[in-house]
Amino acid sequence: AVTADLTALGGKKDFKLDPALMEGSIAVKEGIQAGTYELPVTVKDQYENEYTGKVSVEVTERNKGTDFDWDEAVIYFAVTDRFYDGNTTNNDAYGTGDYNKDPATGSLSYHGGDFAGLTQKLDYLSDLGVNTIWITPIVANEMKKGLATDLPGTLSYGYHGYWASDFTTLNKHLGTEEEFKTLLDSAHKKGMKVMVDVVLNHAGYDTENYFNSMLNGKNMIRSGADLIEGDTKKGPLSNLPDFMTEDPDVRNLLVEWQSAWVSKYDIDYYRVDTVKHVDDTTWAAFKNALTRIDPDFKMI
């Protein structure tokens, strides 16, 4: 076990560091003065022998300005595809006929909402008193044919964003990279923040072959003895392909994909989906990666 004493920073006396990572993201309590702090670190081996040392931490001043803290956020949740169609040219972005707003036949299809639509409605949201917009996942998504709740032969599309087929590209139905950047920039000019939903637990239906080809012969998707029915972390969720996040190579690739969006765009927050279905080490690694990119970045 590895612990650090954070009392000098207003934190816990026994902050636990994950031994698989040997690093951790820490917060400083409001009122702590800027400067360099020496934090005691204790390591216990399997025989309960203790080894102690110290690590230096630099605390810098934060100029809040007109910014607001997380506990002051007024959040509006928008399923982007269902919110407002601001650019009709992306409605059938993949040429697969997956756009259908007919109430009788299109409840499981795309309806046209996009980044451009959100941008056009920022004044409306601001007038409601909203200062944080939470949007559904932005990455490319799969479709699934014949879900149990559907009519036989119907198609259900990932308009909601939770059936990822590629974590490195935007869902074209939602718009272009430029339109996404415009949404972020426009929101920030109005003093608003954007929180993006992300998934690390699973992929979209029928994507096993694609993701299993990513690690040079090592599968990313759980199968066989690794797939345990009824297990919170190692069981399937709605029969979606389940990532073996406890494997360091799988974990690192997922963290790399999802943190890259924060490196590329000025995203303010992440809302993390299916938290209880993923091991704690993966969440710690994800937090560490995001903190390295932006120390003020928040995820819930």
Regions found by a protein language model. Give the residues of each.
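Aromatic sugar-binding surface patches on proteins
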Residues: 18-26
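Short, surface-exposed loop/turn segments at beta-strand-coil junctions that are enriched for proline
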Residues: 27-33
